Amino acid sequence: MRIMQLDRHSLGFPSPEQALHDPNGLLAIGGDLQPARLLQAYQRGIFPWFSPGELILWWSPDPRAVLVPQALHISHSLRKALRRTTLRITLNQAFAAVIAGCAEQRAEGTWIGPSIQQAYCQLHQLGHAHSVEVWQEERLVGGLYGVAQGSLFCGESMFSRVSNASKMALWSFCSHFQRMGGQLIDCQVLNAHTASLGAHDIPRRRYLQHLLNCRSQTLAPRCWLPQSLTLPLPATATQIGE
């Protein structure tokens, strides 16, 4: 099957069902990262992933990794860290710094090049992309970012500069997102780290149905306002890898 070359003058995408099996999920190449195209992609269960300086690659893998917010696993070590931490968590207060931190952590292997950073900062300014920040006093030490689709949040990347910072960001966000009406977090492709946190694979067709349903659901009006988030203590600990 041939891969579709996107036209810069059209925002259309092929059906995700046309994506390759090898490499898993590759659907189209080219186009650009203008906000309208990115939003069209996320609405169809498609996301960009490519190395800086290369053609833009668009993906919709099968299966798809997802995380139910209330099913996030908390390890014994993280549970202890939550009891002792002095870190504080905020929402939508330093988006550009968070995405830069995600790029920095991956160094030579990053896919978060300047064009990706610029594009997602534009989405943030338009109210579609959001960040969670972890602070040690006034220093940014961790965080995550992603794109909202109604009651579904498409997680893109996270980073830590101190132990457990990104996990605390995710735990705090999951609690907040669930309270605001959030239903599901898209983790894209399952790996050992996301699996240890409770993510699991579902068939792409099922993910696309979830996406369709979630896109029409609205969250509490204050969900994405810049604010401080709490770090609630989990009621019970689920033992996972340290």
Swiss-Prot record:
Keyword rRNA-binding included in the entry's annotation: no
Predominant subcellular localization, coarse grouping: cytoplasm
Stored Gene3D superfamilies: Leucyl/phenylalanyl-tRNA-protein transferase, C-terminal domain, Leucyl/phenylalanyl-tRNA-protein transferase, N-terminal domain
UniProt-listed SUPFAM superfamilies: Acyl-CoA N-acyltransferases (Nat) (SSF55729)
Keyword Translocase in record: no
EC assignment: 2.3.2.6
Gene Ontology process terms (BP): protein catabolic process
Transmembrane segments: none
Keywords, alphabetical: Acyltransferase, Cytoplasm, Transferase
Catalytic activity from the UniProt record: N-terminal L-lysyl-[protein] + L-leucyl-tRNA(Leu) = N-terminal L-leucyl-L-lysyl-[protein] + tRNA(Leu) + H(+); N-terminal L-arginyl-[protein] + L-leucyl-tRNA(Leu) = N-terminal L-leucyl-L-arginyl-[protein] + tRNA(Leu) + H(+); L-phenylalanyl-tRNA(Phe) + an N-terminal L-alpha-aminoacyl-[protein] = an N-terminal L-phenylalanyl-L-alpha-aminoacyl-[protein] + tRNA(Phe)
Gene Ontology terms, MF aspect: leucyl-tRNA--protein transferase activity
One cellular component (GO) term of this entry: cytoplasm
Location in or out of the cell: Cytoplasm
Pfam family, one: Leu_Phe_trans
Role, per record: Functions in the N-end rule pathway of protein degradation where it conjugates Leu, Phe and, less efficiently, Met from aminoacyl-tRNAs to the N-termini of proteins containing an N-terminal arginine or lysine.
Similarity-based family: Belongs to the L/F-transferase family.
UniProt cross-references to NCBIfam families, sorted A to Z: aat
This protein's name: Leucyl/phenylalanyl-tRNA--protein transferase
Taxonomic source organism: Edwardsiella ictaluri (strain 93-146)
